[in-house]
Amino acid sequence: MSKYNVLIVGSGGREHALAWKVKQSQHVQNVFVAPGNAGTGMDATNVDLDPADHDAVIQFAKENNVGLVIVGPEAPLVAGLVDALTDAGLRAFGPSKAASELEGSKVFCKNLLRSADIPTADYRTFRSADDASRYIKDRFSEPTDPVNVVVKADGLAAGKGVVVCDTRSEALEAIDRIAARKEFGAAGKELIIEERLTGPEVSVLAITDGETIVTLPPAQDHKPANDGDTGPNTGGMGAYCPAPVLDEETLAKVESSILVPVVHAMKRSRRPFKGVLYAGLMLTPAGPKVLEFNVRFGDPECQPLLMRLKTDLVEVMQAVVDGKLEETGPLEFDPRPAICVVMASEGYPADYEKGHAITGIESADKMENVKVFHAGTQRVDGEVVNTGGRVLGVTAMGDSISAAKLQAYKAVREIRWQGAWCRKDISDKALVTADKA
């Protein structure tokens, strides 16, 4: 079979990890990333394309022998880039615009879960800040009453449109930010207030062609900004894979009671799902329940997952595009666990400083079983500088989770820029689980 070129759409740590893994495929000649970052520019070829400009993406793919387009982030998926590529006769990995509603609208997702009898938190939806505020005030009469609810913007908000509330005033403030002040723009045209679930969180990803499902090893993300899972939510400050908190028996239950029913429900609603299905779950005393669904690889979960993957990723993605996933064998993973520590810019997840030169990436990359995946970086005048909130995903493998953690943080200490910071406790939850086992 002749080799072909692959185009990856996006510019984050997930896209750098995808480019790094796709480059290893025996079927691939060149890897292009649009628009990419400083790291993808080292492992692949960056292309100055706006993912929102569908015609430009199509034109580039047609002119450059692109045999597969991989759409990384949620925004271009929700905007229908895969549909545009497919209509133009190109092969694209990722769900259609209609199927991407599973992430693009939390209201759509919750209603689908309810109709398919898939376990999730009880919820109410609201179209106005006044109605939502009235609901909170009616339920909780005193300003200091504990409320235990979660307020969510309906649309995409870069992982920050979810506010976990402990008091009535916090819930009212969240409603005001999302639905009145429109901090997340059109994402706040509707909002959800749902019961707060308790238990450990875990991410289970699966690859599906709409018929066959291949479940991947579970990973655990760290959304809150600060150690001990405190502080505001972020896009994710680190992850590890596998997650020992989810045993084989529970993983099989997640597949049969959550993943398979969702794929069937999407098919019934004439939105067949092809691509990566990401279930964000809470392991409650009553069993696993869905917090959210995403329609792409998680970022940063993608980094440790792909570091462990031994199977040719491009062959799996081609099988999904062709509707032949059942013909691929089981995926092979390195038995060693991997951990990704996100290094962020000062001020993130609020306003952050950028444009500072970063040193030490090369020496960190040379360390055994370490790969530094770039996110918010660019090369300016020969230097790598920070241009985003989440800047690097320092990823390491080890014979145990504690060994992987040690190696990842050893690599983190090599890297410097003004205001750089990270959480110091990524994977500690896994170490606690392992100690109890």
Curated annotation (Swiss-Prot):
One of its GO terms (molecular function) is ATP binding. Residues 110-322 form the ATP-grasp domain. GO terms for biological process: 'de novo' IMP biosynthetic process; purine nucleobase biosynthetic process. It holds the Pfam family GARS_C. InterPro entries: ATP-grasp, ATP_grasp_subdomain_1, PreATP-grasp_dom_sf, PRibGlycinamid_synth_ATP-grasp, PRibGlycinamide_synth, PRibGlycinamide_synth_C-dom, PRibGlycinamide_synth_C_sf, PRibGlycinamide_synth_CS. Keywords: ATP-binding, Ligase, Magnesium, Manganese, Metal-binding, Nucleotide-binding, Purine biosynthesis. It is an enzyme of class 6 (ligase). Binds 1 Mg(2+) or Mn(2+) ion per subunit. Pathway: Purine metabolism; IMP biosynthesis via de novo pathway; N(1)-(5-phospho-D-ribosyl)glycinamide from 5-phospho-alpha-D-ribose 1-diphosphate: step 2/2. Its cofactor is Mg(2+); Mn(2+). Its EC number is 6.3.4.13. ATP binds at residues 142-203. The keyword Metal-binding applies. Mg(2+) binds at residues 292, 294. It catalyses: 5-phospho-beta-D-ribosylamine + glycine + ATP = N(1)-(5-phospho-beta-D-ribosyl)glycinamide + ADP + phosphate + H(+). NCBIfam families: purD. Belongs to the GARS family. PANTHER family: PHOSPHORIBOSYLAMINE--GLYCINE LIGASE (PTHR43472), PHOSPHORIBOSYLAMINE--GLYCINE LIGASE, CHLOROPLASTIC (PTHR43472:SF1). This is Phosphoribosylamine--glycine ligase. It comes from Rhodopirellula baltica (strain DSM 10527 / NCIMB 13988 / SH1).
